[in-house]
């Protein structure tokens, strides 16, 4: 099962190829304990594709019958954020592969952002340049999300990317 945003459907075969060859191709961006992220070139774009940890037996069943996969939720939440005018990497697609028991593999693809840093860098470095201003703007951003009905339940330092805009704002 998969879904590709209309804007990227002309590249369906390339995107499917990135997924099917994920283990053997792409540029490794993050290798975590649970998930891996690789970068793939698609014409002038760079796609960021996250491969989620293969679920255990119970979660295979849960993700088949009771709960959407992490890849699908990432795609749907990013799409909702975009619809609300909240900055997030442009969602491209999600893919789910099932076996006879349930969910086997899942992938989420989005446009890769350049010149960004993780909120973690600000939290860990009290001397980070413009730290106080970034924290004020981050607080304002979080409040605006809440006002738009978004309750970000996983606001961990690694889940938030920050970019400096041309006007000097973050």
Label every model-predicted segment.
Residues 15-117, 143, 147:
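Conserved ATP-binding subdomain of kinase catalytic cores across diverse folds
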Residues 1-13, 89:
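Broad phosphate/nucleotide-binding scaffolds in NTP-utilizing and phosphate-metabolizing enzymes
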């Amino acid at each position: 099962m998969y879904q590709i945003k209309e804007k990227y459907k002309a590249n369906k075969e390339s995107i499917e190829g990135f997924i099917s060859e994920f283990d053997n191709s792409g540029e490794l961006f993050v290798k975590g304990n649970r998930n891996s992220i690789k970068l793939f070139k698609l014409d002038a774009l760079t796609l960021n594709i996250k491969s989620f940890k293969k679920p255990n037996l119970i979660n295979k069943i849960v993700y088949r019958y009771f709960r959407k996969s992490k890849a699908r939720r990432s795609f749907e939440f990013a799409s909702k954020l975009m619809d609300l005018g909240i900055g997030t990497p442009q969602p491209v697609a999600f893919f789910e592969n099932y076996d006879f028991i349930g969910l086997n593999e899942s992938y989420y693809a989005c446009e890769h952002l350049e010149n960004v840093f993780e909120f973690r860098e600000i939290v860990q470095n009290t001397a980070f340049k413009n730290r106080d201003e970034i924290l004020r703007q981050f607080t304002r951003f979080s409040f605006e999300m809440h006002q738009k009905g978004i309750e970000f339940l996983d606001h961990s330092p690694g889940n938030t990317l920050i970019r400096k805009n041309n006007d000097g704002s973050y």
